[in-house]
Amino acid sequence: MLRFLNLPSLLGEGLGVRLKNINMQITLEELLKSRDERHAHQMELLKEHEGLTLVCLTVVMPGSVKRNVQSLVAAHAGVDALRERFAGETVALEERDLDTGYEAYLLTRLSPLEAKERACEIEETHMLGRLFDIDVIDASGCPLPRSIVGRGERRCLVCDGEARYCMRNHSHSLDELQARINSMIDAYVQRI
């Protein structure tokens, strides 16, 4: 259970607090449509800003509710981490709060490999890093794999095994995943 009440003061500037449609379930069709729209937006940004590297942040939130207090806290923390890690290298940062989840798009002059290294560092060292999905998108619109910078697979939130394996095999219940996310968010909020 989250132990804070003053969400606006906790989050400060940035994504803001849009409480409309919070905890609303989305359908698989809506989720798939949002992925297509995100890819189209990425391609548009790459076309408009040729020569820059695109970094895209989304929040890992299992289940049919993508916008909740936990994902809002994680998104805000992720955007703050991007701002800090890419300080002085950021050309533009766009944040989007959609019914299907939070997204941030950062354009940088860094090479795709250097941007991917920084993205992996955030995912691996931030308290909430496992809740961040930070992709570096190449000129063809494909995300660079972690292996390109010598990083291993993402780890599972619950057992620390390979996340892809646990997800594919439904190794953990939604309740287990949500309990772990709540615990991570609670610990993070207590520290800030």
Language model regions located:
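N-terminal, intrinsically disordered charge-dense segments
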Residues: 1-2
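Glycine-biased, low-complexity coil/linker segments
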Residues: 12-14
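Carboxylate-dense, calcium-coordinating segments in secreted/extracellular and ER-lumen proteins
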Residues: 17-19
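Long, contiguous binding/interaction regions
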Residues: 22-89, 97-99, 117, 123-192
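Short beta-strand-to-loop capping motifs
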Residues: 59-61, 106-113
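Aromatic-anchored, charged helix-turn/loop surface patch used as a conserved interaction hotspot
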Residues: 91-92, 98-109
